[in-house]
């Protein structure tokens, strides 16, 4: 099953365009234009223009799922790189310079709380119809219920795109050695997706075929 997107409805929840645009960029760089076009055809989603606004949630989900179907385990690394690139875009274009400066000079636990609050405020842009909240501050843990970008099914936690976005943001602004570990995933258990941030890092199984972002 390709998971091709249904026709979007006017009232459909939407997700920021980087969920697709940065994935397209990663595919172009690592697999080439022909493979990218194949994934998009499999998803049943047109290539959005670079200046796209918020995109239908179903299209974002379809592209991520089509990539998983087409690339198998290699999709993990590609979605990770897309998440890192999305984090870079947010840092460059969505967080004001003064806010970044304040977060950087604060003690880690305070900077983390400030950044977590900003992420919570704008969570609708990356969870669509899902629900986001800070589950815990010790350790800092994010929770997404009904994550629209989850895999249809998986044997282990597989929300690499979200984990990479969080890791890039907190690694750049708060904890340089941070790693993000998804300890529970809707794709596996049907429950919430839980992401734990380890400020000093933790050895975890990296996504397949991850190269430098």
Swiss-Prot record:
Q: Alphabetically, which GO biological process terms does the record hold?
A: bacteriochlorophyll biosynthetic process; light-independent bacteriochlorophyll biosynthetic process; photosynthesis
Pathway this chain belongs to? Porphyrin-containing compound metabolism; bacteriochlorophyll biosynthesis (light-independent)
Task: Alphabetically list the UniProt keywords.
Answer: Bacteriochlorophyll biosynthesis, Chlorophyll biosynthesis, Photosynthesis
Q: Which gene encodes it?
A: bchJ
Any keyword Heme? no
SMART domains (alphabetical): V4R (SM00989)
InterPro entries from the UniProt entry: BchJ (IPR010249), NO_sig/Golgi_transp_ligand-bd (IPR024096), V4R (IPR004096)
Indicate what this protein is called per its UniProt record: Bacteriochlorophyll synthase 23 kDa chain
């Amino acid at each position: 099953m390709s998971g091709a997107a249904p026709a979007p409805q006017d009232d459909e929840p939407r997700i920021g365009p980087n969920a697709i645009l940065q994935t397209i960029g990663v595919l172009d760089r690592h697999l080439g234009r022909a493979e990218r076009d194949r994934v998009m055809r499999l998803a049943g989603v047109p290539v959005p223009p670079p200046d796209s606004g918020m995109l239908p949630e179903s299209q974002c989900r379809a592209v991520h799922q089509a990539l998983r179907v087409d690339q198998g385990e290699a999709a993990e690394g590609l979605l990770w790189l897309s998440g890192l690139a999305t984090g870079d875009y947010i840092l460059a274009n969505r967080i004001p310079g003064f806010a970044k400066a304040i977060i950087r000079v604060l003690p880690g636990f305070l900077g983390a709380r400030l950044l977590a609050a900003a992420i919570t405020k704008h969570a609708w842009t990356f969870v669509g119809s899902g629900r986001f909240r800070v589950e815990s501050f010790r350790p800092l843990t994010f929770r997404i219920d009904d994550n629209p970008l989850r895999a249809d099914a998986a044997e282990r936690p597989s929300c690499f795109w979200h984990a990479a976005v969080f890791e890039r943001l907190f690694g750049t602004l708060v904890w340089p050695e941070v790693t993000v570990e998804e300890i529970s995933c809707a794709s596996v258990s049907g429950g919430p997706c839980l992401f734990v941030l380890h400020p000093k890092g933790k050895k975890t199984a990296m996504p397949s075929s991850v190269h430098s972002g």
